[in-house]
């Protein structure tokens, strides 16, 4: 254990949590560790990751705004001259970025007038914040000693020494890096190290995986796996749908031209892909999958704007990064240029469509889930653009409208407003992807009335999830409705667990008995059934805590992979990290593996086979 300093963000958070006894308000503190110290540390770490995620995202946003405005530093807002303390940082999170510009208070508009509304749930209070503390509850007066290898330097180039106020230190540390150089080849006035999305991904994976043995997956691995998997999935989708037998993308490209397949129809087929990473971690595979799908569209000659007009640019992947070039030059967004605007809008909405419709992830670690969502938002932020035409009012639960408020005067970019982000968080979920209460198959003998009810619930479920993704003004209420529908669908699930099956059978037996009169003998049987059910419910409740407390129900969680009747149909591709294991470490498990997976078992280490398993 290294030296701990009260001024560090982590220690400051830990101490506030302890002095206020906030573990006692958590429903299940045991999920954060085996003892009190570990629980406080884990809760504090999760809170700090949430806050740092927001700050890193905002630093990238700030870099984008400055780049869009030709280096105009008046668009910088994440510094001590704009943010005095943790109170004002909390105000920035929840009263600025989470509130539409025209709904902000007068004092907030005066102080933060040129900061756009983003709509991201990243700037909504998390469940853990709601239960414990917000960032404004941290102590402002504390200082932190400067690291001996600090990047902060004096005007003479020498490293600074001594200590600084923690928040000021954090702002100056972030400002020592260049967050606005994504894809840019311009010479910087100051020699700053570049922090882009890929570098942040590595940082996230190291922060998040240092305790649980997670490995950083090199870009060439995620690129290769996504390229091989998704290209096969695209070919299969086109061949199956169109009755073709194309062997590669070149043949498919020629077939699209020869058959004069409408551009929008070809795009719709690609957009119907469903890709899942069941151990998503920080989202590296999903980001690579996003890039690969856009690259495939470009290669097939179907990458087009909302009117179906093809883009006049080339899209390739190099070093796990999406590279967009126009006339052999790296594309850079110029919001006053109509063609540049068209390309930027198209790339943003292509990413939005793919993330919303095609990419899904699950992880047992809530910190991983938060980081994965952040990485996908960052990918969208790379192509954020200014809207130049007014939009209708936001969606309402009654339907109608579009997903953004109209621009307000005094917005960013001389009356323009930055396009808001969709609610993509619902595609990345927390849970144990290996444990489920319910089988994927539905009930085998569901009566017609039951099938009709299941279909109605599935239709409503799909509708609400689509509605949620498109920025409703009442997100919390929609989330609640979605959870209620999910629980209603569970009534049509087939239990996996034998104890749960037995409990359901006993309840069904009791309900059948209630249809008839009760003799003394039947009353005794009924009483015995009640006692058995009560005992079984108690035992299963204990099992719920031990085994199923974070179970993930694949049968119901993603309505996008349910058919019209509400039955599970699955994903087109499941991708993920191959297991990094030693043969010796699993020798005791080999007999069980052979019994469970005889089709794949070969007795020797083969990570491809174990990855499939």
Where on the chain are the PLM-derived regions?
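Preference for the N-terminal adenyl/adenosyl cofactor-binding alpha/beta module
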Residues: 1-295, 305-309, 333, 358-371, ...
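Conserved Class I SAM-dependent methyltransferase catalytic core
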Residues: 46, 225, 353-368, 464-475, ...
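Short, hydrophobic/amphipathic alpha-helical patches that form generic packing surfaces
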Residues: 47-62, 205, 374-381, 463-466, ...
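Glycine-biased, low-complexity coil/linker segments
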Residues: 225, 397-400, 409-414
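Short mixed-charge
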Residues: 239-266, 298-351, 381-390, 415-423
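SAM-dependent methyltransferase catalytic-core segment centered on the flexible catalytic loop
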Residues: 284-346, 436-467, 488, 494-498, ...
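P-loop NTPase motor core
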Residues: 346-362, 367, 419-446
